[in-house]
């Protein structure tokens, strides 16, 4: 199981590629990894803020993140999170921008 620090380092290393290929302006981790509750079965929850809109490319982005991290990823855009007030409140409590 990777640590939060390892995940942050991998995302930092790939930040330019994420921006170039997918228009990722900001990327953050939230959920069980940030709270220190992750185990071997946990996925990593990732929030992205994008330069523009994204369609089916979100699937490619998710697959790319899973490939570089070696962990199952739950991915949400900031706009999607903001449109669900209760979800956004949960995310805001433990979000860590990379």
Protein language model annotation of sequence segments:
Residues 45-48:
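Short beta-strand->loop micro-motif that forms the acidic, two-metal-ion catalytic signature
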Residues 1-26, 35-36, 40, 51-98:
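Catalytic core of pol beta-like nucleotidyltransferases
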């Amino acid at each position: 199981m990777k640590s939060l620090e390892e995940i942050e380092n991998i995302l930092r290393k790939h930040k330019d590629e994420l921006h170039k290929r997918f228009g990722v302006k900001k990327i953050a981790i939230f959920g069980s990894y940030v709270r220190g509750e992750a185990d071997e079965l946990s996925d990593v929850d990732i929030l992205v803020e994008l330069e523009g809109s994204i369609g089916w490319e979100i699937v490619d982005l998710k697959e790319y993140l899973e490939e570089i991290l070696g962990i199952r990823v739950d991915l949400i855009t900031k706009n999607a999170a903001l449109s669900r007030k209760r979800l956004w409140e949960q995310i805001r409590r433990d979000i860590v921008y990379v």
